[in-house]
Amino acid sequence: MGDWSALGKLLDKVQAYSTAGGKVWLSVLFIFRILLLGTAVESAWGDEQSAFRCNTQQPGCENVCYDKSFPISHVRFWVLQIIFVSVPTLLYLAHVFYVMRKEEKLNKKEEELKVAQTDGVNVEMHLKQIEIKKFKYGIEEHGKVKMRGGLLRTYIISILFKSVFEVAFLLIQWYIYGFSLSAVYTCKRDPCPHQVDCFLSRPTEKTIFIIFMLVVSLVSLALNIIELFYVFFKGVKDRVKGKSDPYHATTGPLSPSKDCGSPKYAYFNGCSSPTAPLSPMSPPGYKLVTGDRNNSSCRNYNKQASEQNWANYSAEQNRMGQAGSTISNSHAQPFDFPDDNQNSKKLATGHELQPLAIVDQRPSSRASSRASSRPRPDDLEI
């Protein structure tokens, strides 16, 4: 037999990307098929045709009788069987190499984007797209490849083809020469002058090897079926768990929120620009419409911006209070604002709020003046 080292090295690489059932199947293939075929089986069938004798002296009769009894040698038949059942596994290995090549490209691109991010370039959306692609290809941290998506489908298809090839070769072997060998074969074929008897060398030993290879084929077929069910239920389980995965819900296009695009208010609420011009004061009873607090891009809060907002608001109310105007308390409500580190560094550290002096032009009555001079339990001590 030829050298099996090349095929063995390729199949050995599949071990790292197979399930437990796949690893057992590869072990059976290596030990009980390739190793046994290259050592014991080849020596048993080495003198196959030379030891095939017929009770005639007619030239060419033994050759035609041997060709009729054994259209293909058992050893070559098993070699073809090993090659065919290994091809789907090699195709799956090619898909794994393709995913690993994709991983190298994505990692290289991710490093370039991170370098650009240190220079102040906004690359968050591109980095998010790379993470989604890695999840799609089944790439995890530390170079580990997980069976997911197209890789999982390729693995299932490879198991199906291996099972089909196992069944097909078992049927072909049974159709050609069965699962046992006889000591005597009767042949009546030209150029034999009459019906002749041909004798096979070591039929019992060869029958034992045939039965052994049959059992190994059945074990491999059973492992393929078990692995197929295991991968199927594992895929269903991952699909159910995938609903809670952070990447599972990322199906829409990655685009920034449109709510934060237009600067409408001078205060730093959730959807306003810190550099927007001051808007005129609202009339009494008007409620300031702030941004959507549930927006994921407007959830973070900045302490310094909050203090600056209230300082601006206090200054405006003081000016309006000195002019004799009153402002409804409904205007004083908290604001939402984004967590912008660059803008927060430029803002002041905040000011203490001064109480608003509300001027009332009407003269106070005696009752009200007496009531106002009495201390009340809810009065504040200054």
Curated annotation (Swiss-Prot):
Matching Gene3D superfamilies: Connexin43, Gap junction channel protein cysteine-rich domain
Posttranslational mods: Phosphorylation at Ser-325, Ser-328 and Ser-330 by CK1 modulates gap junction assembly. Phosphorylated at Ser-368 by PRKCG; phosphorylation induces disassembly of gap junction plaques and inhibition of gap junction activity. Phosphorylation at Ser-368 by PRKCD triggers its internalization into small vesicles leading to proteasome-mediated degradation.
Sites bearing Phosphothreonine, chain numbering: 275, 326
Region span, Interaction with NOV: 244-382
Region annotation (Interaction with UBQLN4) ranges: 264-382
GO terms, biological process: cell-cell signaling; establishment of mitotic spindle orientation; heart development; microtubule-based transport; negative regulation of cell growth; negative regulation of gonadotropin secretion; negative regulation of trophoblast cell migration; positive regulation of gene expression
Residues in the Cytoplasmic compartment per record: 2-23, 98-155, 229-382
Full protein name: Gap junction alpha-1 protein
Organism: Ursus americanus (American black bear)
